[in-house]
Amino acid sequence: MYLLNQCPDRAVTYEIVCCVTSGETFAEEVRVERRGIPTLVHSIRRFYATRNAPLTDLRVRAEYDAETVALVEPYFPDLLLLDGYLYLVREPLLRAFPNRIVNLHFSDLMLRHNDGTPMFPGVRAVRDAIRAGCHETRATVHLVNAEPDRGMPIVRSRSFPVSPLVEELRARQAADVLRAYTFAHQEWMIRTVSGPLIASALRLIANGLVDLDAANFSGHDTSWRLEIDGLLPERSYAVH
């Protein structure tokens, strides 16, 4: 709701033309519609249930994404923003909006393996980073492609230091407390940076400061990297 309630750029730099939920309901539907923004319910679980298929069936996912395209096209969006959408995006959406789908991921997508794949992809990225011994975590807004969290980074958050208590918890084998800390750390990131970071990415895109068609990002070449300070108070972001 940051983009609706707090972002000064909405209706100035960008406009929200519709909201689509993959859930059964949309908790903020009334608030959104009061602002004149249509809300569309497109339940992914119901869609799969009518086809008697598991959520892992990517052929059905392609059908679902094709219906998503049909739902949003009448609103002529220039960009799709995924917010809490935890499913792989398939070809119908990628083809309809090439390099025009953005997502927020809770790890530093500049951290790459030698083959260019992200070190911490997926929904358990914060847990995996903490387990790997990282001393800080970051969030990244990135372009979406067919591979999970492998699209070009757009903007990166400030660092969130990992508590030194984690090492003590690990030494004591206090797995339950460590799980609780990991959850709290991710909530800290979500509540602090989610809305402002997405807004920063939208501002950069709307002002033409991001080359959305630089689709051949490999994760190896960082010569184009630019650090920008001051986009938000007391925060530093890396724009790619």
Predicted regions, residues:
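One-carbon transfer enzymes
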Residues: 1-240
